[in-house]
Amino acid sequence: MISIQENVFENCFSLSDITIPNGIQSIGSRAFLNCISLSSVTFPNGLATIGTAAFILCEKVIYYDFTQLSSIPTLSNQAFDGLPADCEIRVPASLETQWKAATNWTIYADHIVGV
């Protein structure tokens, strides 16, 4: 498996902390839409794309952890819309500036933290 398909976990209220497995290269549109119990997500190196509204309305997430990635994944529109005000998007410190300036990541720049 190299992708998480569209809508696969949409409205899954039992997910809390998840680690996306190594080898996953893409996350489909609305894959985790409205997962209201989700509190953290860790992404593997090699992730290349995140689909439209993939994590929209996941309103209890404390952080998204991209620190294992060596490159910035392509982000589709509204992927993280509805982020809690205190939610962090954790990225490698060496890529923080580039991440904040990357296409479709700029709207989340206030949440991006280099670690």
Task: Please annotate each region the language model reported.
Residues 78-79, 97-109:
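Short, aromatic/basic amphipathic alpha-helical patches
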